Amino acid sequence: MAKRYWNINLEEMMEAGVHFGHGTRKWNPRMAPYISAKRKGIHITNLTRTARFLSEACDLVFDAASRGKQFLIVGTKNKAADSVARAAIRARCHYVNKKWLGGMLTNWSTTETRLHKFRDLRTEQKTGRLNRLPKRDAAVLKRQLSHLQTYLGGIKYMTGLPDIVIIIDQQEEYTALRECITLGIPTISLIDTNCDPDLADISIPANDDAIASIRLILNKLVFAICEGHSSYIQNS
C-alpha cells in the first residue's frame, strides 16, 4: 500500500482541540504511549502519533475505496450525529448515527429483513398507497416507517456487510466494535485517553468529545475515501 500525502497539520489539529484528553483519573493505562503530558488535570495526546495513525488510516481507506470497497461510519452520540451523516453522505458511505441496534452486523439476516421492510414501506409511501389505506392501518405503517428511517436510514442501500467500519467513539460504540471483531471486519477507531488502543485495527488517538476534533478526523478520512472513489471510477 503506497504512502500518500494527506495534508495532516499539527497546528490545525491543535486548533481543533484534537490533543485534549480526559481527566487524568479517567484514563486507560494502555494509552500511556499516546500521551505526551498532563495539563491542569487532563491528559494531552501526542499529536505526532495522531498524525501518523491518521495518515495510515487515510492510506487504508484510499486503497480500499480505489478497489470499490464499502464503508460504514458509526457515531451515535448527539454531538457527533450530524457530522457523521454529512461526512458519510459526502463520501457515499453507509452510516449509523442514532442508535446501534444490537446484532446489526452479527445478525445480518435480521437486519436485511428490516431493510427489505423499510424499502417496501418507502415505496408504498412514494406511490401514495399508504394514504389509500384505512387511517388506523396507515398510521401504524407510518410509525414503522419513521422508526426504520431513524435507525436504518443511513444503511438503507447496504446490501451486505461493510468492508471497513469507522468508529467515532470507542466506548460509546463498543457493541459495534465487538461485532466487527467477531466478524473479522477491519476497523478504524478514534480513541480518547480512556480507551483501549488494541481493539481496532487502526486506532487514532484523538479527542472524541469535541465536535471540531471529530470533524477534522472525519474530513481527512472522507477526503481520502473520495479520492479513492475517483481512482476507482477512472480505472473502471
From Swiss-Prot:
What's any GO biological process attached to this entry? translation
UniProt keyword annotation of Ribonucleoprotein present: yes
Write one Gene Ontology MF term.
structural constituent of ribosome
What is the protein named?
Answer: Small ribosomal subunit protein uS2c
The text of the family note is:
Belongs to the universal ribosomal protein uS2 family.
Query: Where found in the cell?
Result: Plastid, Chloroplast
Pfam families, alphabetized: Ribosomal_S2 (PF00318)
Annotated Gene3D superfamilies:
Glucose-6-phosphate isomerase like protein, domain 1, Helix hairpin bin
For this protein, the record's HAMAP family field holds: Ribosomal_uS2_B
Q: Which domain of life is it from?
A: Eukaryota
GO CC terms of this entry = chloroplast; mitochondrial small ribosomal subunit
